């Protein structure tokens, strides 16, 4: 069995060593829930990577959005290049769920655009979980939505060995039943083709295809082939092919499901008639009978997911089968930014149920549509073996459920959490102006946090009227303009940035030495303990970082945030004294802010074009091979540009330029 092997050019330092040891001890002791409470910039991802390498268990990492998941996926890929690091997020580029708005009598049909490469990566994740244990899956909340049964996916796989007697006709029928499409002209992911005694299968979860060569009815050779160059990558003695989709059914599943759907339809029609909902009953009868006819003839119908419970043989109310069911029972879960991710996981079920209930009440769907849903919070928790929550500001759930809370407070740079002052609101604007001018004289920047957009805009106008170069950021500012504003702040073109919630920027601003929080004692989301600690962390990149809270009274949230910051600062100062460390402001080039924002947008694009770029690197040693590859890449680039996927087109363009430079260097 292959083990996790961590590759890193640096070793754990500071609090990382103790945090790794504590988490590993907890996992070995059987602790079900633990929390890693680490300040921003303390290297929490590297700590998690070390824990994975020492515990040696299949791992699921959940983040709260695709962008962060893509960043984590890339980091873990770098730490574990020899192991299976997989990416499991929603495969929809665009998704409009089916819904009904009673107030407007408006029915909205489901509309979606599926991303083929993300779909391949989802299948690759389940394939790896079936075949090996050294697996890390980085996912979003998509992992709590329904998938096909792992038993069906495993039981329906096809196994082929060299010297095996093989009926090609039978193999073709099996592949079609596994949702593979025959296409003898173009071989792509999820397809197969037959040429005489040779059958080529492109598994839906791989980036290369298999060629099975037969001598009459006997298998003589199995090879893995590169799809672009045609080069033989490896020869095998045996081969296992899994289904091309997660939702695959055994032969008797559809007839059995249709009987159950008819029974539920009859019961629901009686109920609607008794409630004098005749229009709803007629609508439901027409729609469901059409779906049944399609299921009987084609084995499929539009919106088949609404019949997932009857098809899978689940009882009403039973939890759906999800990605978590594909993991072995001893897997470990890491929840990144748990103070955001856990509430998001818990909210998915209720939001889905409200939408489905309208469809059921007004005769668009049978009650079984409710069972096509994400996991409830309690169901999700019941599937967990061991979990580690990761956050700088753990929520109530993490704090109450964790066997231990492991702190990681020391930054490798020696930087401390900022000093905090509380001042009365009387004369607050004049005080802010003086502090901003003092910062500007030292070539430092300032942030001012307000509660409303109007106040942010008015304050910006006021400061500009005083000659203080100021800009504002809020939800109406587009991404590109936001990047330009943040860049101008770092470059000194702007002295002050005013905003409402600057937490979501996710960008380090080492020049910021002063943060003013207006109305700091107002109770609400923007001034909760968690939000205040996150805001305070914005000044933790500068050695002279200071935060001033303007309030006429100290709220509980303020008190907790101040006490927590003071506690951290005391620990950090003691560590620095003991080790002779002098905190120094982080030095970053101004371009870093643009690069990082562009990296966020490019992460998803890299995932899309990764197979194509790897193919371009595989066999381009000759001028002819490079010329052929450039032509293929240029075609893909134009397709991406036509579909407005500009980040992907740019990555392909860069690869074309790289290949052309190789020819120039070789004098071709």
From Swiss-Prot:
InterPro entries: Helicase/UvrB_N, Helicase_ATP-bd, Helicase_C-like, P-loop_NTPase, UVR_dom, UVR_dom_sf, UvrB, UvrB_inter. Its main location: cytoplasm. Residues 627-662 form the UVR domain. Pfam families: Helicase_C (PF00271), ResIII (PF04851), UVR (PF02151), UvrB (PF12344), UvrB_inter (PF17757). Keywords: ATP-binding, Cytoplasm, DNA damage, DNA excision, DNA repair, Excision nuclease, Helicase, Hydrolase, Nucleotide-binding, SOS response. One of its GO terms (cellular component) is excinuclease repair complex. A motif (Beta-hairpin) lies at residues 91-114. SUPFAM superfamilies: C-terminal UvrC-binding domain of UvrB, P-loop containing nucleoside triphosphate hydrolases. Residues 25-171 form the Helicase ATP-binding domain. Residues 431-594 form the Helicase C-terminal domain. GO terms for biological process: nucleotide-excision repair; SOS response. GO terms for molecular function: ATP binding; ATP hydrolysis activity; DNA binding; excinuclease ABC activity; helicase activity. The keyword ATP-binding applies. It is found in: Cytoplasm. ATP binds at residues 38-45. NCBIfam families: PRK05298.1, uvrb. The UvrABC repair system catalyzes the recognition and processing of DNA lesions. A damage recognition complex composed of 2 UvrA and 2 UvrB subunits scans DNA for abnormalities. Upon binding of the UvrA(2)B(2) complex to a putative damaged site, the DNA wraps around one UvrB monomer. DNA wrap is dependent on ATP binding by UvrB and probably causes local melting of the DNA helix, facilitating insertion of UvrB beta-hairpin between the DNA strands. Then UvrB probes one DNA strand for the presence of a lesion. Forms a heterotetramer with UvrA during the search for lesions. Interacts with UvrC in an incision complex. Belongs to the UvrB family. This is UvrABC system protein B.
């Amino acid at each position: 069995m292959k083990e996790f092997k961590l590759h890193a050019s640096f070793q754990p330092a500071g609090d990382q060593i103790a945090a790794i040891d504590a988490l590993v001890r907890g996992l070995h002791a059987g602790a079900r829930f633990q929390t890693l409470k680490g300040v921003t910039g303390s290297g929490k991802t590297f700590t998690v990577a070390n824990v994975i390498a020492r515990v040696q268990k299949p791992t699921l990492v959940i983040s709260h959005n695709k962008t962060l998941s893509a960043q984590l996926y890339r980091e873990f890929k770098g730490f574990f290049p020899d192991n299976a690091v997989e990416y499991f997020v929603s495969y929809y580029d665009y998704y409009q769920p089916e819904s009904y708005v009673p107030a407007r009598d408006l029915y909205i049909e489901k509309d979606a655009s599926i991303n083929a490469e993300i779909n391949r990566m989802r299948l690759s994740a389940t394939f790896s979980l079936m075949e090996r244990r050294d697996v890390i899956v980085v996912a979003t909340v998509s992992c709590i939505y329904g998938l096909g049964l792992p038993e069906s996916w495993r039981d329906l796989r096809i196994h082929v060995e060299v010297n095996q007697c093989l009926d090609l006709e039978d193999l073709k029928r099996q592949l079609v039943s596994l949702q593979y499409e025959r296409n003898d002209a173009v071989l792509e992911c999820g397809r197969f083709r037959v040429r005489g005694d040779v059958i080529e299968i492109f598994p839906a979860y791989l980036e290369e295809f298999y060629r099975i060569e037969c001598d009459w009815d006997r298998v003589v050779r199995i090879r893995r082939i590169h799809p672009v160059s045609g080069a033989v990558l490896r020869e095998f003695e045996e081969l296992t092919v899994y289904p091309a989709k997660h939702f695959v059914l055994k032969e008797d599943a559809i007839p059995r499901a249709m009987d159950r759907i008819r029974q539920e339809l009859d019961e629901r029609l009686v109920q609607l008639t008794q409630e004098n909902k005749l229009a709803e009953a007629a609508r439901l009868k027409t729609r469901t009978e059409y779906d049944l006819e399609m299921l009987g003839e084609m084995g499929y119908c539009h919106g088949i997911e609404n019949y997932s419970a009857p098809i899978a043989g689940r009882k009403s109310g039973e939890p759906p089968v999800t990605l978590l069911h594909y993991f072995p029972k001893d897997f470990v879960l890491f929840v990144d930014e748990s103070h955001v991710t856990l509430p998001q996981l818990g909210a998915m079920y209720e939001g889905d149920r409200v939408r489905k209930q309208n469809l059921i009440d007004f005769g668009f769907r049978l009650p079984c549509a409710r069972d096509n849903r994400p996991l409830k919070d309690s169901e999700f928790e019941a599937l967990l073996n061991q979990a580690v929550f990761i956050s700088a500001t753990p929520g109530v759930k993490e704090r109450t459920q964790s066997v231990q809370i492991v702190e990681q407070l020391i930054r490798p740079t020696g930087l401390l959490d900022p000093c905090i002052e509380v001042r009365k609101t009387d004369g607050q604007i004049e005080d802010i102006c003086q502090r901003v001018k003092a910062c500007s004289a030292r070539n430092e920047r300032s942030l001012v946090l307000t509660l409303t957009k109007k106040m942010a805009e008015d304050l910006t106008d006021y400061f500009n009227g005083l000659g203080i170069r100021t800009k504002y950021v809020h939800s109406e500012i587009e991404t590109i303009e936001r990047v330009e504003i943040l860049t101008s702040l770092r470059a000194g073109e702007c002295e002050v940035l005013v905003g409402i919630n600057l937490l979501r920027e996710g960008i380090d601003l080492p020049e910021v030495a002063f943060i003013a929080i207006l109305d700091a004692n107002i109770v609400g989301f923007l001034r909760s303990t968690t939000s205040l600690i996150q805001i305070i962390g914005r000044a933790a990149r500068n050695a002279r970082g200071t935060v001033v809270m303007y309030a006429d009274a100290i709220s509980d949230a303020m008190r907790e945030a101040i006490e927590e910051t003071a506690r951290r600062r005391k620990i950090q100062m003691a560590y620095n004294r003991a080790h002779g460390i002098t905190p120094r402001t982080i030095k970053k080039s101004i371009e870093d802010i643009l690069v990082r924002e562009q990296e966020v947008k490019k992460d998803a694009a890299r995932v899309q074009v990764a197979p194509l770029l790897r193919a371009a690197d595989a066999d381009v040693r000759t001028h002819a091979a490079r010329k052929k590859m450039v032509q293929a890449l240029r075609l893909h680039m134009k397709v991406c540009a036509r579909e407005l996927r500009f980040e992907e087109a740019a990555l392909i363009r860069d690869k074309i330029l790289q290949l052309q430079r190789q020819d120039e260097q070789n004098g071709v």
